[in-house]
Regions:
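N-proximal low-complexity "stem/linker" segments adjacent to membrane-targeting elements
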Residues: 1-27
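Cell-envelope/extracellular polymer assembly enzymes that use nucleotide-activated donors
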Residues: 6-9, 37, 183
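Short, acidic, metal-binding catalytic loop of nucleotide-sugar glycosyltransferases
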Residues: 26-35
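A conserved acidic beta->alpha catalytic loop
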Residues: 42-51, 68, 92
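Glycine-rich, basic loop-to-helix element that forms the pyrophosphate-binding segment
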Residues: 66-83, 104
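Short aromatic/hydrophobic "clamp" motif used to bind/position activated sugar donors
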Residues: 88
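Conserved donor NDP-sugar-binding/catalytic core segment of glycosyltransferases
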Residues: 100-132
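Conserved nucleotide-sugar donor-binding catalytic segment
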Residues: 141-224
């Protein structure tokens, strides 16, 4: 490509997203600066996802299409390989990008010198009662707080992310795991990268009944992911000097961190 490299590449994998892709793409393009690109990976789509995108006439939009299904991690790695920006941001094909997102995030990542920066999300969907909206608490997480929170849960909303292309390269992209985002944040923290979450809202995050992370099969695969739990154990050793239980129960893990027999962290 002979055009100058953009400042920002936004990557979006999509599989059969005909009902939501146009809104996701348009809201992202509206929020992006002029010197940015939106890369969308069509992962073996069999519906009208491509036709919906072809109705959008914007030179910043690039479509990559695969006939064989890759899955999220492989699709994201294919997008990272094509991205030309110094900064990389994520979006999902069923979410909505808020208009101020990139203006705010570009300012903050430059100011904080973070390797990876996240925003907060407003959850939306018919299953959320009574109004269909549920904002996350607008709380900032410092790099130190974020690293500790990773031992308890995944505190970061993946499609709210913006990070440096250099950081993505050092991490080697995404690994094939049920929780490819959580795995990457654990590895980034273990590598000493500066990750933080700003208090402001970046996206509207769609919640629906057939969400992958709510399915029993996905949860079973996650429990068997030894590589992820090893990375989590390594991070616990690096931060705390002791292991934490494998149980996912928040109270058990919190007790292990704050009530260590050497006095914990306080």
């Amino acid at each position: 490509n002979t055009n100058p490299a953009p400042l920002l590449s936004v990557v979006m994998p999509a599989h059969n997203a005909e009902r939501t892709i146009k809104t996701a793409a348009r809201s992202t393009l509206m929020a992006m600066p002029a010197n940015a690109e939106l890369l969308i990976f069509l992962d073996a789509c069999t519906d009208r996802t491509r036709q919906e995108l072809e109705a959008i006439h914007d030179k910043r939009l690039r479509i990559i299409e695969a006939t064989n299904q890759h899955g999220v991690a492989a699709a994201l790695n294919a997008l990272l390989a094509q991205a030309r920006g110094r900064l990389i941001a994520r979006m999902d094909s069923d979410d909505i990008c808020l208009p101020w997102r990139f203006r705010s995030q570009l300012h903050k990542i430059g100011k904080t010198k973070a390797d990876i920066l996240f925003g907060n999300a407003v959850l939306f969907g018919r299953s959320l009662r009574p109004f269909g909206l549920l904002p996350q608490f607008p709380i900032r997480l410092s790099p130190q707080q974020g690293a500790l929170a990773l031992l308890l849960t995944n505190p970061f909303v993946h499609p709210s992310m913006i990070g440096t292309a250099a950081a993505m390269k050092v991490l080697g992209g995404y690994r094939e795991t049920p929780a490819e985002d959580y795995d990457m944040w654990l590895r980034a923290s273990l590598a000493g990268m500066r990750m933080e979450r700003s208090a402001g809202y970046a996206i509207l995050y769609r919640v629906h009944d057939n969400q992958l992370t709510q399915q029993a099969a996905w949860k079973q695969k996650l429990q068997k992911d030894n590589s992820l739990f090893k990375t989590r154990a390594d991070l616990a050793h690096a931060l705390l000097g002791f292991e934490i239980p494998m149980e996912s129960d928040l109270a058990i893990v919190s007790k292990a961190i704050w009530s260590d027999n050497r006095g914990g962290l306080i």
